[in-house]
Amino acid sequence: MWVQGHSSRASATESVSFSGIVQMDEDTHYDKVEDVVGSHIEDAVTFWAQSINRNKDIMKIGCSLSEVCPQASSVLGNLDPNKIYGGLFSEDQCWYRCKVLKIISVEKCLVRYIDYGNTEILNRSDIVEIPLELQFSSVAKKYKLWGLHIPSDQEVTQFDQGTTFLGSLIFEKEIKMRIKATSEDGTVIAQAEYGSVDIGEEVLKKGFAEKCRLASRTDICEEKKLDPGQLVLRNLKSPIPLWGHRSNQSTFSRPKGHLSEKMTLDLKDENDAGNLITFPKESLAVGDFNLGSNVSLEKIKQDQKLIEENEKLKTEKDALLESYKALELKVEQIAQELQQEKAAAVDLTNHLEYTLKTYIDTRMKNLAAKMEILKEMRHVDISVRFGKDLSDAIQVLDEGCFTTPASLNGLEIIWAEYSLAQENIKTCEYVSEGNILIAQRNEMQQKLYMSVEDFILEVDESSLNKRLKTLQDLSVSLEAVYGQAKEGANSDEILKKFYDWKCDKREEFTSVRSETDASLHRLVAWFQRTLKVFDLSVEGSLISEDAMDNIDEILEKTESSVCKELEIALVDQGDADKEIISNTYSQVLQKIHSEERLIATVQAKYKDSIEFKKQLIEYLNKSPSVDHLLSIKKTLKSLKALLRWKLVEKSNLEESDDPDGSQIEKIKEEITQLRNNVFQEIYHEREEYEMLTSLAQKWFPELPLLHPEIGLLKYMNSGGLLTMSLERDLLDAEPMKELSSKRPLVRSEVNGQIILLKGYSVDVDTEAKVIERAATYHRAWREAEGDSGLLPLIFLFLCKSDPMAYLMVPYYPRANLNAVQANMPLNSEETLKVMKGVAQGLHTLHKADIIHGSLHQNNVFALNREQGIVGDFDFTKSVSQRASVNMMVGDLSLMSPELKMGKPASPGSDLYAYGCLLLWLSVQNQEFEINKDGIPKVDQFHLDDKVKSLLCSLICYRSSMTAEQVLNAECFLMPKEQSVPNPEKDTEYTLYKKEEEIKTENLDKCMEKTRNGEANFDC
């Protein structure tokens, strides 16, 4: 990025080459003497230093960084600890090369400035990428004093003192390093000399380090190393080194002597080439590097002491200056406050002088205004503030409390015994045992009948409805005053606390009102006496002092009493009072609702008892007859026999050498009529079965046991779907070869309705499973009451000659989504209408704990292009078997990712297939982009925002949406918009409808030819 974004700057600094710098770092000379300058101290034996010969390199690095880094971008993504970055040093706001040591948090990192050795915690925003030409080894090297190490038991204070001491000997001073060895981490172990002073010996004398034990291999000392993280953090707490305060990123100032002359010439050459390099004013004097080797250690200590004293005095000076400024600011603030207080005092004095002139007038007017309010309040009943309405409600609840009727408990016991007797009959398998249980049940019925009569009589005698009306009115009136009640525990302690509070408040208010009356009476008496004093017509001697005495006290007392009464009457109650009233209100409302629930329970039981009594009278000691059902079955048997005979007769006439057309036509009409009669009787049979099923479930569970010949138990287990009177050969069926790839399908007509017969091969075990699964599906459809969104099942019957089960369903030609989209795709409005119906179908199934597992474009139907319904599934397969088939719609798999991973099918997998179908209908012929999990990407399509949101929830995010939530999605709740007429679309749709009508007409003709024996497969 730096090369692309700053090519112009890069070209301007082409003369600055770093190849030499890299070469210098790569040349490592052991057993040599190096002249270095200390740049950073880590501890009493470890420090970082820069070679004297690298001064010019540091200048070049600083110039390049100052140009590159401000324009570079902050580092994104993960930080590489082996990579060199540019870091903004906090002290001088200049850029230096650094490496990341540790990631502290998302925003902060610990870095080391590799050309100086010190560390700092930086924000990620202060770290930038630098070009490859600046990615070379560090200028500063890490050194360790030869033969020394820090004692493992050294205290922190001594450790810090040792670090400071070594800094006074080495930091920013020219020292000679006699290299002895190099450790594995690159630390150079050397003997350090400053002039004639052996720095290691001085550190050892001070006790800040101790000698190492000689190693067997090298002279490298064995030392217990400090944790690098702890050492870095400890160095962070130490004072910022002086090199951090330099400007323009220079490390050393201009050298003295021959080094100064050489650098001046070099810089002059660079200035002539166009690369201006300036030196800061506060740069360190390189002359300090050339201190004479004869400088004594005592001189070093004196210099260090003077530096420390100067720093201390400077700190004290700064502190005093800050204190002076703070005091000066405080004096100014106090002066301003004093001036404000003087102005306020003058205003107050003027106000008091004005007030005193009108004091009596103002006070009497205020008292008169309060008296007007008090008169109005005396005419208002404020007892509600003391919970009078709650007290009245409690009294109503206590006085007319409705209790559970005595006969109800006995009724519940007998009813439970009766229900148990019915259950025993239901589970009984032997007729002899069943007869005994039936006799016991009948005896229990007699007792139950008498108990029901007693209960009805007791309820009739009680004023149940009147009490309920009273409670409802009371509840409404209280809710109008107090609003929503909070939930709380039912406790008599709350009511006791309320009564105590009410008595205290009433007593307090009575006392205050009496005090107000007394004060007003005293004030009136004073005015009457005063009137006589100033009335010249009154004869006699009156002492004015007696009349005028204590008027201020009288006014004060009167005002206080009036205000106190108004406060009680007008001011809002305190939190404690409100809490007591609120708790009491909640308690009262709970009692009201509890009694209402009891009354509602009794009323419901009363209603059930009335109905039970009516029906019980009809069936008491009686058993329903199945004769009518047997009569229907007998009629059906004869009709089916006659129908079969007519079919044989028709076949014989058609196969004769000289067929009589009129006779054949007559027999066909008779056959059609016989078929209609058969189905009419089958529907009558179903009605009779429904009636017997209702009786068996409610009154006579013994019916399946006593009359096994009618097959009532099978009918009940099938949910009313199974019929034993329908047979395959009774239907005029036409094979549907184009739809029979998986199972035999035939098309027929029943009472004017075109139906499909689906054939399933079954054995003994599969037959029961098919009936059970079809019955569960059928019950879900019936319970939805016409708004199921499911394909209805008409009949289920078993073939007597072959191991086949047949399912009769309505036939919707060319109405499945695959056919509709192939002929004329649904528009967006039609798609939403259809898919809302499909969502309703899935909701119906999932509500009944049924997982479809086989939702695809061939078994979802769009009736009239606006009503969507979900087709049935293969009832011979379990849900796992159905879901294991990978159905495709175009290039899109309808199998959810969890199914592909081997997890069981769930409502979520149904909704995934639903979402894929909705996406397919919405984008039509556009290509899908699939990710590695097989999930289609939705964002690539331009769809309505609400539809896209639903698709993302169903397909991409895989949120735990339910079918009910899908049904209530915003895209399905949009108001119907007035669609703009599209003549081309209307014409296309009209042609499509005509084409469909022609196809249907041809299909009907073909069906008729099949009936006449003239069918061919070209129609």
Swiss-Prot record:
Coiled-coil ranges from the UniProt annotation: 298-355
Residues holding ATP: M716, N717, S718, G719, G720, L721, L722, T723, M724, K737
GO cellular component, one term: acrosomal vesicle
Expression (tissue specificity): Testis specific.
All copies of domain Protein kinase, residue ranges: 710-1019
EC numbers on record: 2.7.11.1
Enzyme class name: transferase
Annotated Pfam families: Pkinase (PF00069), TUDOR (PF00567)
Catalytic activity: L-seryl-[protein] + ATP = O-phospho-L-seryl-[protein] + ADP + H(+); L-threonyl-[protein] + ATP = O-phospho-L-threonyl-[protein] + ADP + H(+)
UniProt GO molecular function: ATP binding; protein serine kinase activity; protein serine/threonine kinase activity
Domain Tudor: 78-137
Keyword annotations: ATP-binding, Coiled coil, Kinase, Nucleotide-binding, Serine/threonine-protein kinase, Transferase
PANTHER family referenced in this protein's UniProt entry, alphabetically: LEUCINE-RICH REPEAT RECEPTOR-LIKE PROTEIN KINASE IMK3-RELATED (PTHR48008:SF6)
Family statement drawn from the similarity comment of this UniProt entry: Belongs to the protein kinase superfamily. Ser/Thr protein kinase family.
Protein's name according to its UniProt entry: Serine/threonine-protein kinase 31
